[in-house]
Amino acid sequence: MSVTESGVLVDVADRLFEAIANSDIVTVKELLSEEVLVWHSGDSRDSAKERAARIIDWFINATTSRRYEVIERQFFDGGFVQQHILHADGRNGTSIHMRVCIVIKVGTAGLITRIDEYFDPAEMAPLLDTSN
């Protein structure tokens, strides 16, 4: 049975974004395979699991609330593509509303093996502002 047919992809997608929205870094780490590679717009290289988890942890700690407005999610055998608007309120009093396209591959063990995330890195700048 393929990953798509087993319903694993729907579960992984829902759990990942729900975990980030709910500040649950433990679940995020559990969903990532040990060999996962993650690339974000603006990155010069892929990140391994530890660095990828640190980036998500930073985002969770830099924000007080996060919400994903899913525009579209399409599944393919072994993964999915999602377009969404990420709404987040920063601890520094700022807010972001970023349009994102993310491609996620899921291995046969039901763990994420690859993430490619496309967005305008400049839209994260308000969260980095410590002058507020």
Question: What residues fall within each predicted segment?
Answer:
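Hydrophobic alpha-helical core bundles mediating ligand binding, dimerization, or RNAP-core interactions
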Residues: A13, I20, L32, A52-F59, ...
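Alpha-helix C-capping/helix-to-loop hinge sites
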Residues: L16-A19, V38-W39, A88-D89
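A solvent-exposed, acidic/Ser-Thr-rich amphipathic alpha-helical stretch
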Residues: I25-K29, S33-F76
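Short N-terminal micro-motifs specific to bacterial/archaeal maturation
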Residues: A19, G42-D46, I115
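Alpha-helical structural motif
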Residues: V12, D24, R51-A52, L111
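Short, low-complexity N-terminal intrinsically disordered segments enriched in polar/charged residues
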Residues: M1-E34, D129-N132
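Short glycine-/acidic-enriched loop or helix-start segments at secondary-structure transitions
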Residues: S6, A48, M124
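A beta-strand edge to alpha-helix "cap/lid" segment located at domain peripheries
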Residues: V3, D57-N132
